[in-house]
Amino acid sequence: MTSAVSSLTLRLTADGFVYLYDLSDEETEAGAQEGYHTRRQSQFVPIDWSRVSALWGDIIAQHPILSDPEGEVRVLYPASHYVVIPSGMSGEQDVHWWRLTAPIFADEEQYYSDSYALGDGKPGLAVGFSHLLKGFLQRSFVACRFIPTILPFAQRVLRQSSLQTGLSLGVELIEGGCDLVLCQSGNLLRANHYSWPRYRSWQHHLYQVLYFLSKVYLDSSVDHSAPVSIILSDGTAGTDSLVGELLQALHRQFTTADWDVSVMPIDYWYA
């Protein structure tokens, strides 16, 4: 598929993921001529979550500390269920890294908030939890800890939008699953050389998310029948297909896996 895709939704299940994407006008018209009147398409890709977990566990074990190109500041990567996703950088103003830790949410009534100062003294992160899990980011990074015990409690997280010129990240936790929403204006997620020294593409950001979600799926306290959805939205879709890039990247990463990609009936998605 060569046309641009404006959004891509991944629904993770215990045995893989379904991705649902928008069709281009040309594809929609071609489908209508064949009797298919839809603007969205869904496909299923099987994934061995234990393999994903092992692969990324090895990578993180080998590189627990990632340094910025100048080696001045380190970002520490903790254990499982912890996701750190850097945003796109807007030039020289945000090229420096800073140490980032995350709050731990233990129960429904607990409230936690903290902020992290950059070298210029500006706050970097503030996260809270009380009935609703709320997170907002004021600079370029956000960290969210996925702990299975909070999944039944939080109904949703307020989705974020248009924070500076970089990544806008929201997390929605609902009964029986959680949504991780990445909204990106422009192509910063695809080529973010400043914010991810070793893994420099948006696909690698997604790999990180898949790894930590696989840890959640492998946890015995999680209901494996509950799907997890990831929504990627490219605010200004370019000439490349998000779906095509995703599948190619996954194929490259898991070359020994059995990639039997098949079109699933539409009721699979909504079941």
Which residues fall in each region the model found?
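Hydrophobic/aromatic-enriched cytosolic interaction surfaces used to assemble or bind macromolecules
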Residues: 1-271
